[in-house]
Amino acid sequence: MQDGNFLLSALQPEAGVCSLALPSDLQLDRRGAEGPEAERLRAARVQEQVRARLLQLGQQPRHNGPAEPDGAAEAARGASRAQYHTLQAGFSSRSQGLGGETSTFRPIAKPTYSPASWSSRSAVDLSSSRRLSSVHNGGGAFGAAGYRGAPPTAPVPARPVSFHERGGAGSRADYDTLSLRSLRLGAGGPDDRYSVVSEQLEPAATSSYRAFAYERRASSSSSRAGGLDWPEATEGPPSRTIRAPAMRTLQRFQSSHRSRGVAAGGPGGVLEPVTRAPSVRSLSLGDSGHLPDMRGLDSYGGHRTLQRLSSGFDDIDLPSAVKYLMASDPNLQVLGAAYIQHKCYSDAAAKKQARSLQAVPRLVKLFNHANQEVQRHATGAMRNLVYDNADNKLALVEENGIFELLRALREQDDELRKNVTGILWNLSSSDHLKDRLARDTLEQLTDLVLSPLSGAGGPPLIQQNASEAEIFYNATGFLRNLSSASQATRQKMRECHGLVDALVTYINHALDVGKCEDKSVENAVCVLRNLSYRLYDEMPPSALQRLEGRGRQDMGVPPGEAVGCFTPQSRRLRELPLTADALTFAEVSKDPKGLEWLWSPQIVGLYNRLLQRCELNRHTTEAAAGALQNITAGDRRWAGVLSRLALEQERILNPLLDRVRTADHHQLRSLTGLIRNLSRNARNKDEMSTKLVSHLIEKLPGSVGEKSPPADVLINIIAVLNNLVVASPVAARDLLYFDGLRKLVFIKKKRDSPDSEKSSRAASSLLANLWQYNKLHRDFRAKGYRKEDFLGP
């Protein structure tokens, strides 16, 4: 037999040891045959041995050796000689090989993973410091060619080709589920003391946390045509590859069809080449729910139906898929839901058609199906159906979908819980549904997801596997959207038992273990920021009365009047505010619970730690600064108490200045708003002026060509300078010394837009206050400024 009839493979074996054995006469059902028939059977056994041997060789790395036959050499010409490290758990668990009892293909390796660390459909954990990259392997063929010189199979990509990608190789990756983006809220109210409610990512801004593409790199020494990408173990941060559940379902049907086809072919038949792509998503063979028995499809049309379904989604349309949802066979229900999920991934017309075909109520009925695989695909399909489609969201709610989702959330299946929390997150982007979602879901979501996965009342460290982390991320994204709704919704969230405690506990634990860049931390801080919005106006009156404490008016000390023999400027009188703060601290609980966290002195330290330690996620630091801005805003006494606490005990000014130097416009809005509140309540404005003035002046524009921050940032900066100038000669002197006058005069005279009109009025007020320092008039004139520059229009 000529070796040229076979193409060797560069695919690695998944099992470290492979044993070979000839098929017995009993297996061939011809034991005891003699003469020419015996010779034919012996030849068949030899052929079977060669074929099995080639399977083994095809799964081992190729080494340099003797010259290959012409056919193999021609097929392997240009192949890369890269070395590949063995990844025992890096490939699909459905590897095909000859069994010892029958001629059908059976798995030869079953990687096992701890159920406590990964869901049955999550990515394989390579290690904490290793990730998969891809190396292009030139023209090497994949898998052994068919017996009797069948032509080589087409190259298989590094993952199964998506239904959306069949039109071209340059299409985008088909991810596990849609990457969820939250809603950006409009501008806040006219009251600029408060931080506007935390804004979410726009639909155009993708989140790198949810979706990871399988990167492909072509070797510069080989042609792209016919090339393959193989995973190679390299050092680096952990990464994930994700395939849509619909495509995984399709792969199961195809694999089962191949196995049954080979069994029907018999020993002398043509063996179908096994073409599968390397995969880092393992499907456990031990769970019968993952590998449905395709024999159940026989009652729906026999082998032709099986062949049509297992060939992929080409022969299925949306009406047929919706009909499959009503079938009694769970396999058909899975296939129908998988097709709907796949078709509605990014097709708005398909979502509309599915709603007209009554797919929504039929999927809702499957949320709590007895078969867990049906539940997963039904919720996965609904997750895509409601994404960016207000009509489908409303249809889901009208079909009692929220109740069914919360029932499904009680199941202890991570894949199902990921889908349910993802659906809730998608629903929460609709302003019309936020109040209803808050009323119906908050308590159960807190009890089932937030409290258990945040570490509240549990172990001292966060212990989440990858699936649980995604579930918690979805839940906090859902809360982030709800918290930007109405006052009633914010109040309901504040009063929900365990909700605020879970968020604070999670952030504290994340800081302790160095996970402050985590996207769930970002969501949690944004929720706290939104719940702090107009806090003193919306908090219970009894709590507000307790926070007001015993001020000077309660002590019977009118402003400016001496206490006993002390003059108005005496040290004793200056210490009264500090004493009052101490009395109020004694009245605040040292162990805050629930909404008490929102105004607790301890929360100031939490936000300060985030500002100091979070270096990469600017949304988290912006939210922390915004939350501090909210609780230090206004004329309430407690706002002043927390401002002085932040300045004097937490020493927050230096971290804020570090952020101001490098912040973008979004961060500057919150940072300067917070500094504005602190400057109004600071005791020592001279010290604050020395640290602040020069850095703030750098942010002001001085000419037409200079880059200018947004108008609200300009107004905040000028307001800070004004707060300092009216109380500190040091601030007035530094404004003159650091060329602040030139910039203020420029801002005052620039009135070419409504925003510049506002900043012009703020600059005019500051210049008028500067002119009150008579001792500086000579210096003003020396710099070329006149009285009209300060007091003129």
Curated annotation (Swiss-Prot):
Modified residues (Phosphothreonine): T249
Residue numbers of Omega-N-methylarginine PTMs: R81, R260
Superkingdom: Eukaryota
InterPro entries the UniProt entry points to: ARM-like, ARM-type_fold, Armadillo, Plakophilin/d_Catenin
Required for binding to PKP2 mRNA: annotated span: 513-793
Site note Interacts with SFN, residues: S282
A cellular-component GO term for this protein: cytoplasm
ARM repeat copies, ranges: 302-345, 348-387, 390-429, 446-484, 488-533, 592-633, 641-680, 685-726
SMART domains: ARM
Region (Disordered), start-end ranges: 56-82, 221-240
Topology relative to the membrane: Peripheral membrane protein
Described purpose of this protein according to its UniProt entry: A component of desmosome cell-cell junctions which are required for positive regulation of cellular adhesion. Required for the localization of DSG2, DSP and PKP2 to mature desmosome junctions. May also play a role in the maintenance of DSG3 protein abundance in keratinocytes. Required for the formation of DSP-containing desmosome precursors in the cytoplasm during desmosome assembly. Also regulates the accumulation of CDH1 to mature desmosome junctions, via cAMP-dependent signaling and its interaction with activated RAP1A.
Quaternary structure, from the entry: Found in a complex composed of CDH1, RAP1A and PKP3; PKP3 acts as a scaffold protein within the complex, the complex is required for CDH1 localization to mature desmosome cell junctions. Interacts with FXR1; the interaction facilitates the binding of PKP3 to PKP2 mRNA. Interacts (via ARM repeats) with GSK3B; the interaction may be involved in PKP3 protein degradation. Interacts with hyperphosphorylated and hypophosphorylated RB1; the interaction inhibits RB1 interaction with and repression of the transcription factor E2F1, potentially via sequestering RB1 to the cytoplasm.
Protein name, per record: Plakophilin-3
Lineage, highest ranks first: Eukaryota, Metazoa, Chordata, Craniata, Vertebrata
Gene name of the record: PKP3
